[in-house]
């Protein structure tokens, strides 16, 4: 079945465009060392390059990805191996894929009632972290001391 769903596109379109986005991200990481680490623009350069009025209809993802290429000079590339101001730990391939799953499922895990799976996995993993760090048992989820971020 390939009908337009709550994705606002058909599932086939979603797959096709999703692969393009993943390829764009992979290409970015393959070439990250070729970008200057720090932004190469002056204040207002990016805004001045944007259209004065919003688009009247949706745009193709190919065009959006081309726009992303144009944005590169206005970015500080925190994940670059040449960026030494802070640790380059803001993201990773597994984290990007996990973000896709989290965003794709649209889960809001603010309470156990809103997503038992989120809450129970979070508390379990944090209990593992307590053990790995050799912290006292009082920081585990079965006490009043912790277990949820």
Predicted regions and their residues:
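Conserved core of the PLP fold type I
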Residues: 148-149
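N-terminal entrance/gating region of PLP-dependent enzymes' catalytic architecture
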Residues: 1-145
């Amino acid at each position: 079945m390939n009908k337009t769903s709550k994705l606002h596109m058909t599932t086939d379109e979603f797959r096709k465009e999703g692969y393009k986005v993943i390829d764009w991200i992979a290409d970015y990481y393959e070439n990250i060392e070729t970008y200057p680490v720090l932004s190469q623009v002056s204040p207002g350069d990016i805004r001045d390059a944007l259209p004065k009025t919003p688009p009247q209809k949706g745009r193709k993802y190919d065009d959006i990805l081309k726009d992303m290429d144009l944005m590169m000079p206005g970015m500080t590339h925190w994940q670059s191996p040449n960026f030494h101001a802070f640790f380059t730990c803001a993201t990773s391939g597994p984290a990007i894929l996990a973000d896709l799953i989290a965003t794709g499922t649209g889960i809001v895990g603010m309470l156990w009632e809103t997503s038992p799976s989120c809450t129970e996995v979070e508390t379990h993993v944090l209990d593992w972290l307590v053990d790995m760090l050799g912290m006292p048992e009082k920081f585990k989820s079965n006490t009043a001391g912790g277990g949820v971020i």
